[in-house]
């Protein structure tokens, strides 16, 4: 188990939180009524020198829950055909159960207390994950019920950009717009962006925190 006093350990960097990068693709903006169609998650790790890196990736196409709204505008935007059998979609329960299981293992292995969602405009992704978990009656949700790390806000501060593609490019991370609005691609790029922002702060001397002056 990791030592929470080790500032180069993941458990020591974010107050015991285990950050997991999430992106969802949906059939609308309402987490209660609109379908969750795709979800990806990237866990993170810290090396011995305290640099944050992407770790494991999980990705699922998701079947719309019974009675879910499918907004035509949203489907046209993300290009998803929920009826396409080649999607290999699974239920919300199966997708989130697999993600939650992997996240709980990561929390334990890294010596953390609880997971926290990292996402671009994080409130959107967080709301869909929480709503789907409730519909699926998944009781052991490892994620904080409201706290998130929002890479849109962090990018606005550090890079002067809030759009994911522009923030990635400003950070020196390639971004292929033709692959955008794929949950898998967006999650991978968001994970790279979050790691870059955290590591850049470390390079600038912002972490570990300077010891408080005595007297």
UniProtKB/Swiss-Prot annotation:
GO function term, MF aspect, one: nucleic acid binding
Domain Exonuclease: residue ranges: 20-194
Keywords, alphabetical: Exonuclease, Hydrolase, Magnesium, Metal-binding, Nuclease, tRNA processing
One Pfam family in the UniProt entry: RNase_T
Residues at the catalytic site: 181
Similarity comment: family membership: Belongs to the RNase T family.
Reported function: Trims short 3' overhangs of a variety of RNA species, leaving a one or two nucleotide 3' overhang. Responsible for the end-turnover of tRNA: specifically removes the terminal AMP residue from uncharged tRNA (tRNA-C-C-A). Also appears to be involved in tRNA biosynthesis.
Subunit description: Homodimer.
The name this protein goes by in its record: Ribonuclease T
């Amino acid at each position: 188990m990791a030592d929470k006093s080790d500032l180069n350990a993941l458990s020591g960097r974010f107050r015991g939180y285990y950050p997991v990068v999430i992106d969802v693709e949906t059939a609308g903006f309402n987490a209660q009524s609109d379908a969750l169609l795709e979800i990806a998650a990237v866990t993170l790790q810290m090396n011995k020198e305290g640099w944050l890196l992407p770790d494991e990736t999980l990705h699922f196409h998701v079947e719309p829950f019974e009675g879910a709204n499918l907004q035509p505008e949203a489907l046209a935007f993300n290009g998803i055909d929920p009826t396409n059998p080649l999607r290999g979609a699974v239920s919300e329960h199966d997708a989130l159960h697999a993600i939650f299981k992997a996240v709980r293992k990561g929390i334990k292995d890294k010596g953390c207390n609880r997971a926290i969602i990292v996402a671009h405009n994080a409130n959107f992704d967080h709301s869909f994950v929480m709503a789907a978990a409730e519909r699926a009656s998944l009781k052991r949700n490892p994620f904080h019920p409201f706290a998130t790390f929002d890479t849109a806000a962090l990018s606005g501060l550090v890079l002067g950009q809030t759009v994911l593609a522009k923030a990635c490019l400003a950070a020196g991370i390639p971004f292929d717009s033709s692959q955008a609005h794929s949950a898998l691609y967006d999650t991978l790029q968001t994970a790279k962006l979050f790691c870059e922002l955290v590591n850049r702060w470390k390079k600038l001397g912002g972490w570990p925190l300077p010891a408080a002056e005595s007297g």
